Structure formats: structure tokens, C-alpha cells
């Protein structure tokens, strides 16, 4: 059963400016594993923007936006084929009673924008 869907679009230039103007931007909003992935991608703004949009999309699919939790509670990584995967913090498991669920996420970008779409399925 589908529990929720969410989508988000981010201007890549806005993320570039945030990274330049705030040296703590990446550490504030992304987990250590995400930052390690960004290092492999040479801190590409498209990649960072895509992850940011994915976190927003998942929060919308949860139905709450970011109320009672933060961006680091949603971790967006890649599997061995490069497919984005989502890990949620224990806090979110408890907040939303997510015992048996799947999160499907799609991330794409153009030269100017990154977009993500999330579906949460309860099994």
C-alpha cells in the first residue's frame, strides 16, 4: 500500500551559493556517508542538489515536511549500480511507525535544476 508520495525541485545555483557562503552547509545537512559519496563525485553541485531534493521529497512523502526531525535523519546513498537508496534514522522509524516499508526514489537534473520523486510503500 502506498503511504505517501513527495517531489521536490532545487535550483542548483542556490545550492552552489549556499555551499560557498556557509562552510558548514554540507556538514549541517548531510551524513558522513553522504559526504564520502560527494567526495567521490568531487563535490559536484548537481549531485549535492539532487540529494538535497531527495531528502525534501522523502519528507513530503512522510506527510510532515521537516517537523520534529532534520535533514540528517534522511540519508540518500547509491547502490553498487548507482541507484539512489534511502536510509532513515531510528528516530524516523519510531515517529512514523515504519516497521515494514520500501522507499522508492528517483533523482534527475538539468543544467539548472535538480528534481527528486519519492514513494513510500508499506508492506
Swiss-Prot record:
Mg(2+) binds at residues 8, 56. It holds the Pfam family ACPS. Its EC number is 2.7.8.7. Disulfide bonds: none annotated. Its main location: cytoplasm. It is an enzyme of class 2 (transferase). It catalyses: apo-[ACP] + CoA = holo-[ACP] + adenosine 3',5'-bisphosphate + H(+). Keywords: Cytoplasm, Fatty acid biosynthesis, Fatty acid metabolism, Lipid biosynthesis, Lipid metabolism, Magnesium, Metal-binding, Transferase. It is found in: Cytoplasm. Transfers the 4'-phosphopantetheine moiety from coenzyme A to a Ser of acyl-carrier-protein. Belongs to the P-Pant transferase superfamily. AcpS family. This is Holo-[acyl-carrier-protein] synthase. It comes from Clostridium botulinum (strain Eklund 17B / Type B). The gene is acpS.
Amino acid at each position: 500500500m502506498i503511504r505517501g508520495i513527495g517531489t521536490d525541485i532545487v535550483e542548483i545555483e542556490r545550492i552552489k551559493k549556499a555551499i560557498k557562503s556557509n562552510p558548514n552547509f554540507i556538514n549541517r545537512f548531510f551524513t558522513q556517508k553522504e559526504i564520502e559519496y560527494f567526495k567521490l563525485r568531487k563535490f559536484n553541485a548537481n549531485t549535492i542538489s539532487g540529494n538535497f531534493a531527495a531528502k525534501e521529497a522523502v519528507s513530503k512523502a512522510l506527510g510532515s515536511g521537516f517537523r520534529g526531525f532534520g535533514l540528517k535523519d534522511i540519508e540518500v546513498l547509491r547502490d553498487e549500480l548507482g541507484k539512489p537508496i534511502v536510509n532513515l534514522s531510528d528516530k524516523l522509524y519510531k515517529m512514523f511507525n515504519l516497521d515494514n516499508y520500501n522507499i522508492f526514489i528517483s533523482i534527475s537534473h538539468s543544467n539548472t535544476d535538480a528534481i527528486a520523486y519519492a514513494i513510500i510503500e508499506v508492506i
